């Protein structure tokens, strides 16, 4: 099932075209025991061995990707543009620019793999201790963007674009480690302490590896600004921020850009980013700037509710206070919930019009079944039974059945759409990966 557009693949991945998941680490030998595990209550579960911990946390990682793609405004935008590209350019056989519109979203994922630079692998083994700086660059294919530089003293170790891939992978990592922590907390005291220490060691080992910068960049940046957060607090805080950013409407992103433009020193490139945000793109820049702004927020006396303890104890309350005090201080009447509601309805209507095309039914069923419950609880607080999911491929094409599965035969779904999938894949491989953007020279006003 290997495709051009997919999440990072260590032990599994989600295919961005079909929204299918493959667990590439395991085959049919784990099917029976895993399907039994998936029916258990995660709030009381205790892992009996390393395999149980690995497979459950891996599944929570991958279904986070699926849910981000099928329940958030960003995911609905991505899939709506994908389906319009299929309808208007592939099925109609017309030479239209629908692929360029689709690539607005695709490119914001792809910039990580296209532009990341590792300059010194010998010094890139302790990234968390590195000094971080950021600067803006212009790329002829992707436009203006933010690069994060890692330094060991004066030596540049790595330069990493801040991308949508980092948001998606950080959200999945949060789910993966939070489910491990939850189950460890169900253990007896002595074993619990050992398990939590091993989980923390695994996490900070991940943070220090340059090979996993798509996973660890946001955590490193957040931990450096809020060093007092323990692991669970850090994971939940990052998840709260990412969930919020993934569900921003285009109007909200545009509104936030009016504040962000005043925070950018390099106005030549910064104004081009602001222009991009004014059309609802570059939402990953919102996350980057929010982390910096929140650091400023908690250190300013003019605000009443900027209690840093809320980041630890109730990050949703902290985010709400940050929006109501800090953002609204600079942007009057910022809260635009009605814009999100309207945008959501537009995407749902678009999917309903394409109901027989590729994965429209899958996206609609997931969104209508899962979006509400995910607005009330974190994924790691939910059992697999609570969520409507597609079944999952294992590495030998056997199928891992979800206990509350969407009524789609994934093998048949893949085979029926194989010609279409291959044509999409070919088009993406044979055309330049390009984001339609405004050149900094052409920005007249923001």
PLM regions: where:
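An active-site-proximal "capping" alpha-helix that borders the catalytic cofactor pocket
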Residues: 167-180
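Post-HEXXH active-site segment of zinc metalloproteases
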Residues: 53, 69-111, 149-154
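Low-complexity, serine/threonine/proline-enriched polar segments
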Residues: 90-141, 300-312, 319-320, 328-332, ...
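Non-catalytic terminal regions of proteins
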Residues: 1-60, 69-73, 192-446
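Short acidic alpha-helical/loop segments enriched in Asp/Glu that coordinate divalent cations
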Residues: 182-194
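Active-site-adjacent bridging/hinge elements
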Residues: 136-153
């Amino acid at each position: 099932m290997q495709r051009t557009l997919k999440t990072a693949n260590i032990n599994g991945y989600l295919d961005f075209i079909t929204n299918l998941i493959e667990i590439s680490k395991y085959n049919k030998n784990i099917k029976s025991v895993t399907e039994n595990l998936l029916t258990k209550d995660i709030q009381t579960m205790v892992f009996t061995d390393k395999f149980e911990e690995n497979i459950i946390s891996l599944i929570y990682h991958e279904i986070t990707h699926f849910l981000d793609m099928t329940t958030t405004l960003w995911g609905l935008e991505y899939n709506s543009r994908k389906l319009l590209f299929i309808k208007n350019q592939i099925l109609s056989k017309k030479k239209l620019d629908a692929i360029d519109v689709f690539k607005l979203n695709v490119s914001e994922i792809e910039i990580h793999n296209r532009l990341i630079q590792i300059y010194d692998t010998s010094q890139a083994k302790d990234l968390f201790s590195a000094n971080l700086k950021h600067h803006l660059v212009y790329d002829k294919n992707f436009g203006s963007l933010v690069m994060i530089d890692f330094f060991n003293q004066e030596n540049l170790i790595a330069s990493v674009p801040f991308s949508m891939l980092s948001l998606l992978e950080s959200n999945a990592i949060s789910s993966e480690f939070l489910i491990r922590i939850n189950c460890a907390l169900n253990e007896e005291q002595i074993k619990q302490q050992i398990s939590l220490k091993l989980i923390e060691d695994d996490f900070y080992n991940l943070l220090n590896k340059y090979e996993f910068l798509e996973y660890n960049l946001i955590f490193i940046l957040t931990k450096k600004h809020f060093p007092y957060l323990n692991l669970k607090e850090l994971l939940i805080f990052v998840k709260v921020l990412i969930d919020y950013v993934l569900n921003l409407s285009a109007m909200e992103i545009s509104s936030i850009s009016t504040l962000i433009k005043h925070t950018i020193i390099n106005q030549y490139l910064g104004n081009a980013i602001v222009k991009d945000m004014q059309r609802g793109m570059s939402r990953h820049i919102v996350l980057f700037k929010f982390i910096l702004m929140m650091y400023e927020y908690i250190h300013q006396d003019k605000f009443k509710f900027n209690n840093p303890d809320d980041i630890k104890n109730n990050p949703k309350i902290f985010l709400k206070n940050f929006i109501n005090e800090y953002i609204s201080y600079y942007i009057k009447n910022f809260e635009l919930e009605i814009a999100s509601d309207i945008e959501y309805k537009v995407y749902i209507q678009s999917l309903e019009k394409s109901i027989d095309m590729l994965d429209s039914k899958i996206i609609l069923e997931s969104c209508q079944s899962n979006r509400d419950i995910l607005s009330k609880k974190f994924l790691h607080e939910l059992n697999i039974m609570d969520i409507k999911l597609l079944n999952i491929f294992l590495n030998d094409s056997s199928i891992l059945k979800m206990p509350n599965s969407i009524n789609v035969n994934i093998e048949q779904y893949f085979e029926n759409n194989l010609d279409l999938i291959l044509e999409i894949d070919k088009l993406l491989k044979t055309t330049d990966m390009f984001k339609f953007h405004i050149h900094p020279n052409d920005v007249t006003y923001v």
